[in-house]
């Protein structure tokens, strides 16, 4: 008879087989009520799963990530059940869990509308309230395929037909609706209380643009009303901060159909861009980087030698000229090796740090493009460090210090670090990988930095560390990376003369801090909601005259501040001062400098912050000192 070991090490012995729910009820009625599923010997199972032998068991409730996934997967089925009741001719396809929710794809004679979603959600609530038991049965593959074809679900049958013939498949039924799924699911639909349908989109069957277009319905589901409300609030905040809307509001950039995934930078946006570039150029110079510039279009032979032509060709823009094939570079690394290869290098030249604000182009699918966050043309703060194996740890350590300084200057201090180690398919010996992985982990440990291990997630050419930022809405953005590369230098004939006179292949460290400038600026726009710190703001201050009497003085001060390198403008329009203040406050200019007769007489300005705070009357020199301090300290 089964002996069940619980997570706290305690054991429970039973005289007969018992279900996961039965064990939960034996522990206590509160746990039984909260039980959604279980984990038996490491495998997730339904609450109805019968235990017949000695096992380890943990109960899944809504308080865990596993529980939340069960809720979301089950809610996707609830959505499909509601759609089938409301639109019987619709066919169901797939409905996976995604971050913060789920989606389900449907084949129907028309796309669903936002009005349809309201009706579908109400039907889902009705079905949840009915509290249908969710039951599981198993069928052989061919029998499952025949079953779904028999009820008119051709898409499900196609999915099943692609599964090996000897497989048994599980089906889950609730009320009159049955769907294919590996499970586990909640015990009954009454467990599904806190959900919301979010939007409708199009999706090709099996992700292939040659197939028919389906309707994808997105939803979210949570363990409590409080969690659902908080998520909806975050979405509303994200919508309010959407960089595409703010880009238009603050006249920063636009993207148009004639150049999909390519950015048209407006003066305000380009001001931010160049401020970031100048900042990165200076911090890299101070940290031993030498800036280079490499060609935009390169013969395919280099990409063949580097391995990119075989692995990345579909994502490359190519062109033919004079019977030669060229590619617009999708990354900078092969070109950086060409710079390294010019002239024989010695061990005394290492580490050699080559940096480029490299413009790259990748032929991303049009459906994946999203404002500045996913583009086809972008610039990276790209650099490659050529060094010996013994230098890896020190270089990673120095780079990490630089990365954290840069992130802090931009206002990000919550950084998630992940170390990805060797995959099954890789180049290089285990001994070399051991050294490289240890160098990366030791560099992080020496700084006392917390990090997560991702076994097997490294690139085929070497392990890597990825640095992700968490923004004010709790969203995570992977920006920085440092990757060890044992492959490319050798493929492209890079060598240096070692201390013993032998020729050796250097290790190459690929590294970036911001990643794509475009994406990083998109993150900044949303993080600051357009209220950029003074050092980044397109316009750092605006001078406002009260009457025409101050116009000459205002222009004089404007020119003086511009000559000091500040980004300032003047507003001499014949409008009431209150109107002008409101207009520039809406534009989130850091400082408004109001000038009346008294300010002219005293060679001063009345300073207002963008939040409406009165900073008092200052001499022009005093304001200059204030702005210089704000810029140099990277104050937020």
UniProtKB/Swiss-Prot annotation:
Which CDD domains does UniProt cross-reference here?
TGS_ThrRS, ThrRS_anticodon, ThrRS_core
Which cysteines are cross-linked by disulfides?
A: none
> Which SMART domains does this entry report, sorted A to Z?
tRNA_SAD (SM00863)
Query: Required cofactors, per record?
Result: Zn(2+)
What GO molecular function terms would the record report? ATP binding; metal ion binding; threonine-tRNA ligase activity; tRNA binding
Origin superkingdom: Bacteria
- In its UniProt record, which GO terms are filed under biological process? threonyl-tRNA aminoacylation
Q: What is the free-text note on the cofactor?
A: Binds 1 zinc ion per subunit.
Q: Which reaction does it catalyse?
A: tRNA(Thr) + L-threonine + ATP = L-threonyl-tRNA(Thr) + AMP + diphosphate + H(+)
Ordered alphabetically, the record's keywords are: Aminoacyl-tRNA synthetase, ATP-binding, Cytoplasm, Ligase, Metal-binding, Nucleotide-binding, Protein biosynthesis, RNA-binding, tRNA-binding, Zinc
A UniProt-annotated Pfam family: HGTP_anticodon
The residues listed in the UniProt record as binding Zn(2+), with positions renumbered to this chain, are: 333, 384, 510
- Provide the E.C. number(s) assigned to this enzyme: 6.1.1.3
Location in or out of the cell: Cytoplasm
Q: Sorted alphabetically, which InterPro entries does this protein's record hold?
A: aa-tRNA-synt_IIb, aa-tRNA-synth_II, aa-tRNA-synth_II/BPL/LPL, Anticodon-bd, Anticodon-bd_dom_sf, Beta-grasp_dom_sf, TGS, TGS-like
Record-annotated TGS domain positions? 1-61
- PANTHER family per record: THREONINE--TRNA LIGASE, CHLOROPLASTIC_MITOCHONDRIAL 2, THREONINE-TRNA LIGASE
Q: How does the record describe its quaternary structure?
A: Homodimer.
- Protein name (database record): Threonine--tRNA ligase
Species of provenance = Saccharophagus degradans (strain 2-40 / ATCC 43961 / DSM 17024)
């Amino acid at each position: 008879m089964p002996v069940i070991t619980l997570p706290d090490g305690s054991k429970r012995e039973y005289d007969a087989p018992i279900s996961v729910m039965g064990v939960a009820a034996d522990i206590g009625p509160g746990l039984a009520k909260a039980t959604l599923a279980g984990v038996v010997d490491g495998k997730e199972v339904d609450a109805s799963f019968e235990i017949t032998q000695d096992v380890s068991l943990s109960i899944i409730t809504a308080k865990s990530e596993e529980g939340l996934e069960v809720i979301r997967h089950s809610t996707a089925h609830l959505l499909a059940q509601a759609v089938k009741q409301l639109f019987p001719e619709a066919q169901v396809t797939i409905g996976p869990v995604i971050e913060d929710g789920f989606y389900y794809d449907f084949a129907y004679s028309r796309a669903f509308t936002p009005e349809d979603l309201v009706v579908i959600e109400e039907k889902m609530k009705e079905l949840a309230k009915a509290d249908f038991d969710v039951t599981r049965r198993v069928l052989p593959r061919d029998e499952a395929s025949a079953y779904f074809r028999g009820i008119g679900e051709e898409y499900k049958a196609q999915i099943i037909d692609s599964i090996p013939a000897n497989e048994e498949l599980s089906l889950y039924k609730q009320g009159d609706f049955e769907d294919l799924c590996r499970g586990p699911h909640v015990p009954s639909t009454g467990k599904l209380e806190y959900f919301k349908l979010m939007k409708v989109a199009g999706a090709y069957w099996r992700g292939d643009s040659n197939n028919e277009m389906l309707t994808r319905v997105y939803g979210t589901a949570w363990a409590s009303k409080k969690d659902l409300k908080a998520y909806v609030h975050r979405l509303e905040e994200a919508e309010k901060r959407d960089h595409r809307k703010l880009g238009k509001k603050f006249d920063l950039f636009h993207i148009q159909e004639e150049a999909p995934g390519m950015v048209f930078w407006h003066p305000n946006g380009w001001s931010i861009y160049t401020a970031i570039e100048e900042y990165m150029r200076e911090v890299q110079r101070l940290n031993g980087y030498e800036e280079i510039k490499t060609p935009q279009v390169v013969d395919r032979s280099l990409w063949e030698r580097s391995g990119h032509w075989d692995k990345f060709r579909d994502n490359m823009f190519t062109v033919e000229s004079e019977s030669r094939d060229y590619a617009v570079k999708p990354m900078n690394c092969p070109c950086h090796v060409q710079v390294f290869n010019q002239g024989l290098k010695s061990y005394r030249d290492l580490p050699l740090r080559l940096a480029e604000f490299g413009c790259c182009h990748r032929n991303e699918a049009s459906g994946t493009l999203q404002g500045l966050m996913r583009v086809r043309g972008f610039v990276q703060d790209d650099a490659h460090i050529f060094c010996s194996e013994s230098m890896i740890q020190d270089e990673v350590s120095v780079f990490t210090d630089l990365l954290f300084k840069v992130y802090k200057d931009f206002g990000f201090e919550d950084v998630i670090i992940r170390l990805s180690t060797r995959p099954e398919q890789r180049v290089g010996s285990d001994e070399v990988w051991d050294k490289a992985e240890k160098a990366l982990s030791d560099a992080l440990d020496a700084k006392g930095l917390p990090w997560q291990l991702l076994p097997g997630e490294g690139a085929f050419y070497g392990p890597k560390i990825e640095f992700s930022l968490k923004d004010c809405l709790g969203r995570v953005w992977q920006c920085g990376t440092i990757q060890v590369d044992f492959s490319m230098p050798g493929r492209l004939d890079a060598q240096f003369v070692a201390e013993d006179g032998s020729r050796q292949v250097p290790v190459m460290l690929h590294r970036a801090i911001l990643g794509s400038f475009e994406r990083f600026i998109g993150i900044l726009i949303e993080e600051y909601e357009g209220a950029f710190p003074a050092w980044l703001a397109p316009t750092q201050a605006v001078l406002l005259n009260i009457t025409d009497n101050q116009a000459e003085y205002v222009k004089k001060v404007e020119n003086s501040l511009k000559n000091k390198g500040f980004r300032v403008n003047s507003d001499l329009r014949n409008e009431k001062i209150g109107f002008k203040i409101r207009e520039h406050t809406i534009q989130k200019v850091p400082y408004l400098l109001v000038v009346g007769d008294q300010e002219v007489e005293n060679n001063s300005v009345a300073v207002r912050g963008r939040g409406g705070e009165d900073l008092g009357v200052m001499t022009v020199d005093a304001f200059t000192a204030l702005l210089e301090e704000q810029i140099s300290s990277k104050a937020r």
